[in-house]
């Protein structure tokens, strides 16, 4: 019996492969546990179409992320904070605060706090480079300017 694997199966094959298996193993284990489907032309064509659609969707998402990174690199985000006598901020600037200010000043950019990578806490005024990891290997950098109120 030929089956189309829906997920990786140890000692048999990887997802998307068509494998020849014994009837009992195919029916009682693979198909019953939804690890495979009977490999008919219709099932194979449907699976290929789903894979193609998924790849197109991922390519579109990656293109949108790359465009967002290009936009981010042109931005300098300004954050006004109260400063103590020694020049340090009252509290550190957090990822949440950066995303809120970004939404206020640039509404078209919608970043989540988990996308922002802070190497160390921002506790004084100055210009800092903030790294953004958007997934799919897309990484960008933008600047924030911390100014005393």
From Swiss-Prot:
UniProt keyword rRNA-binding, yes or no: yes
GO biological process: translation
Top-rank lineage group of the source organism: Bacteria
UniProt cross-references to SUPFAM superfamilies, sorted A to Z: L9 N-domain-like (SSF55658), Ribosomal protein L9 C-domain (SSF55653)
Metal-binding keyword on record: no
A GO term from the CC aspect: cytosolic large ribosomal subunit
GO terms assigned for molecular function: rRNA binding; structural constituent of ribosome
Pfam families named among the record's database cross-references: Ribosomal_L9_C, Ribosomal_L9_N
Keywords: Ribonucleoprotein, Ribosomal protein, RNA-binding, rRNA-binding
InterPro entries cross-referenced by the UniProt entry: Ribosomal_bL9, Ribosomal_bL9/RNase_H1_N, Ribosomal_bL9_bac/chp, Ribosomal_bL9_C, Ribosomal_bL9_C_sf, Ribosomal_bL9_N, Ribosomal_bL9_N_sf
Function of the protein: Binds to the 23S rRNA.
Family statement drawn from the similarity comment of this UniProt entry: Belongs to the bacterial ribosomal protein bL9 family.
UniProt protein name: Large ribosomal subunit protein bL9
């Amino acid at each position: 019996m030929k089956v189309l694997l829906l997920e990786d199966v140890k000692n048999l094959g990887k997802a998307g492969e068509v494998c020849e298996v014994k009837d009992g193993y195919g029916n009682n284990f693979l198909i019953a546990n939804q690890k495979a489907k009977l490999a008919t032309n219709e099932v194979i064509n449907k699976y290929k179409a789903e894979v193609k659609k998924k790849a197109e969707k991922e390519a579109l998402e990656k293109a949108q992320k790359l465009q967002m990174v290009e936009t981010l690199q042109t931005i300098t985000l300004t954050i006004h904070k109260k400063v103590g006598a020694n020049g340090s901020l009252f509290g550190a600037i957090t990822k949440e605060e950066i995303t809120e200010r970004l939404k206020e000043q640039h509404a078209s950019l919608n970043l989540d706090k988990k996308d922002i990578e802070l190497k160390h806490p921002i506790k004084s005024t100055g210009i800092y480079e903030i790294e953004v990891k958007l997934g799919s290997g897309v990484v960008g950098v933008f600047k924030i300017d911390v100014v005393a109120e």
